[in-house]
From Swiss-Prot:
GO terms for biological process: DNA recombination; positive regulation of metabolic process; regulation of DNA-templated transcription; regulation of translation. This protein is one of the two subunits of integration host factor, a specific DNA-binding protein that functions in genetic recombination as well as in transcriptional and translational control. This is Integration host factor subunit alpha. One of its GO terms (molecular function) is structural constituent of chromatin. The keyword Coiled coil does not apply. Heterodimer of an alpha and a beta chain. Keywords: DNA recombination, DNA-binding, Transcription, Transcription regulation, Translation regulation. It comes from Shewanella amazonensis (strain ATCC BAA-1098 / SB2B).
Amino acid sequence: MALTKAEMAEHLFETLGINKRVAKEMVETFFEEIRSALESGEQVKLSGFGNFDLRDKNQRPGRNPKTGEDIPISARRVVTFRPGQKLKSRVESSNSEK
């Protein structure tokens, strides 16, 4: 099961008592700030959680799996996420409790 933006907004509504429309706007604004920063080439650091980084990948050779034809995979910029130590520790400890 995955946590959705709608579930995050619902949790804000239940926990903080703000109305659902405002909670949804808060969640959307949070993710839009991350998107905007990444689009403008900035790193996003969320203390205690992790970092979103941009990485440039060079062009490399590839192969069409259906035809076996060699094709170039173009250079591109990708987003990577590196979890912080606190997040890693909490995930590891919750996994060992199961």
